[in-house]
């Protein structure tokens, strides 16, 4: 695969990796980490604790998949429109 779709695919993968990886050197569950808004922290006991990567990775996978599909459809529509216009 060469050209613009391959370049776009590389950018999508790079964006996905950047979103999943998070901030380099960020300690998990540290004060001031993501998931804490101001001084509000959830200190109550919960029935089940779900890790942030356990929630975010499937979310980002789904969003990336949907974005790639939408871009592919728009690309095909534009190709067909340009082909019909030049014929």
UniProtKB/Swiss-Prot annotation:
Topology versus the membrane: Single-pass type I membrane protein
Protein name, UniProt field: Envelope glycoprotein N
Subunit structure: Interacts (via N-terminus) with gM (via N-terminus). The gM-gN heterodimer forms the gCII complex.
Positions in the Virion surface compartment: 26-51
Annotated signal sequence range: 1-25
Annotated GO CC locations: host cell Golgi apparatus; host cell membrane; membrane; viral envelope; virion membrane
Superkingdom: Viruses
Similarity comment text for this entry: Belongs to the herpesviridae glycoprotein N family.
The encoding gene: gN
Residue ranges, Intravirion side: 73-87
InterPro entries recorded: Herpes_UL49A, HSV_GN
Transmembrane spans: 52-72
Keywords of the record: Disulfide bond, Host Golgi apparatus, Host membrane, Membrane, Signal, Transmembrane, Transmembrane helix, Viral envelope protein, Virion
Protein's cellular compartments: Virion membrane; Host membrane; Host Golgi apparatus, Host trans-Golgi network
Function: Envelope glycoprotein necessary for proper maturation of gM and modulation of its membrane fusion activity. Also plays a critical role in virion morphogenesis.
Keyword presence, Lyase: no
